[in-house]
Amino acid sequence: MSKTDSSHPGRRQLLQAAGLGSLLAALPPARAAAPAESGDLLQAQSEVRLALLMGNSEYPAPFDLPPIPKNVHDLRYVLEQRGFVVSDALNGNLPASRKTLDDFIAKAAAAPADATLLFYFSGHGIQVDASNLLLPAGLDPSGKPDTLRGGSVKLIDDVILKIPPRKGGTIVAIVDACRTSLKAGADGGLNQVVAPADCLIAFSTGAGRPAVAPAVADRSTFYTASLVKLMESTSDQTQFRDLFQLVRTDVRETMLHHPVEAIRRLAQDSFIADSTRASCTLAPRGIATAAGPALPDAEQEEQDFQALTDAVWPADVVERADAFLKAHPKSAHAPAAMVAKNGGAEALKALRRREVRLFKTAFDLPAALATDEDMQRDLHRAGRGDKDAAARIAQIQRNRRDTANWMNRYEGWLQLASALGNGIASYDLALHYRSQNQPLLSSQWESRAREQGYTPPPSLDNVRK
């Protein structure tokens, strides 16, 4: 995590004074009444929610990160308001970090299958040999790769894959960590990942980019500040997956309009890997949201939102989302409509790129897959700019091989996923064209994958060439 330079007091003062952008100021408040006390909420809700927050600020000079305790403190408060039972740990060394993780994983294993589990890390993060490492307190981020590899927590192997899979539940992993190498010439940033089924992974910025941390203890990082603000203020009906898209937009716009040029130059565009299936709203299951006065157009509002929900083709998504926001600007569904509109616009832009050969007919569900809920879900999400959904559809097309144009559809969906920022899809295209004896295309797509911040594991990179 990059730290704003404390040797420039003017820059520090500007960063302290800057608030988050007002892009989402028009969204409706989370509740019509004050939130319930967290103890009352836990007694009333039917959904089990567990969270572990790990934050490390104490690293060898000059790598300390003063804002991390505030990050953890503020996020804990808002998560408890959202019905989570929260554990936190600050500045643990490697043994302490592993013990903390083991305790949380044991609690997760004992939780119901439909529980919501959340893991958050804020501190330094490094990529070594394509593996994403979370550095414990006291470990020098500029150390040798072998030292970092042996002295860190592996995000995927030690955290994500050890949390028991959910059936009807959701796992959320949030990493607000350094995204650029702290050694010249080393691999840059954390690596792109594929989230396991029923899991969402959010990084505070894209591969090869720094996540900015103030040099003072009374300011949060941009990403966590936005996450806390929007988790507290966004409507109860908002899905967690939509929340992270709202945070992504808010952080980017806030930093792009920051008065400090260096901050504008480092504007973060968070990475999100989403393989969730269950509905998971900010309000826990079993909690009735505070009802406002009955509105005369409530029935029409629900009909209009259903029409938006049913839309698949990106142009239809944008049109219906725009109409919904104009007709119902204060609706509790407004955050979801905003995410749909922005995502549909991204999908349309990607489909217009010259290298993407995918057409409207590809968004029509084949008869053989008419009852496939996963395929239906991914078609809807791809039409809203979901890079991971597009990549999953590509794999479905590849596995079918029972239609004359399966290969064209496979390539087209991977091309769309790549255009939406999926570096792993770009690398899959490189491998595909290599297998088709098209070395020029293979080289082009491999270069694209690396530009997007994806580093293939050494075994895959070396063996499959």
Segments the model singles out, each with a brief description of its role:
Residues S38-L42, V48, V86-D88, R98-S122, ...:
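Caspase-like (clan CD) cysteine peptidase catalytic core
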Residues A367-D374, T403-W413, N437-W445:
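Structural signature of tandem alpha-helical TPR/SEL1-like repeats
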Residues S2-S22, P28:
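N-terminal secretory signal peptides and thylakoid transit peptides that target proteins
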